[in-house]
Amino acid sequence: VQAVGDEADSDRLWRFSASADEFLALCGTAGLGKVALMEPDTVMTWLRELAADRRWRVREGVAIALQRIGRESMPHLLAEMHLWAGEGPYVQRAAAAGLCERDLLRENASTVQVLEILDRITSSLSGATDRKKDDFKVLRKALGYCWSVAAAAAPDNAQPYFEKWMGSTDRDVAWVMKSNLAKARMEGLREKLSPSKPRRGKAKPKPLSKAKPKPRARARTRTRTRTRK
């Protein structure tokens, strides 16, 4: 996939991205990230359409293309993803997966915007009505790891969002937060979010109780019976 994106010209990438063959479509879609800065409007419109493709490999190709765009121009990618965050679940999933790549989150300012986008997407997840559809499940799964990638890059900025969503009564949002907190990269933030347990002082030794003296047995008194003469 990477080789095709690097070697193929833009015409071939366009053709591949529209192919009925899933692998060719994956390669062409992923490679369009190289063309995006030269033809931004056309490419981003097409990628947004492909983000909702029924084939999961093509949808994955969109995320790869977005990451490639981000490596060239993170401000351009962020501007587009703010728009995608208001789209349907498949497109939102592409935005989250495209942004939450560790090497794209080296600057705090970028990560702060990514957290804002994830917050918007999570808000729409909590308001979803039909949760049995595939697009909802795909978005839920992506959010189950994307938050932790962004949070690991900027834990202090992420903490208020986690505190907010950890208090949600929505079962799917609760799963998303729990899944992210279970990641090894979340160890530091997980400790901050855990309720602190009060320290227990050392128990003072109980004073030894003195044994009570046993009561002395009373001496029996003999009663004499007088005999009448």
List where the protein language model places each region.
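Alpha-helical scaffold domains
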Residues: 1-216, 226-229
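Long, intrinsically disordered low-complexity tandem-repeat segments
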Residues: 221-225
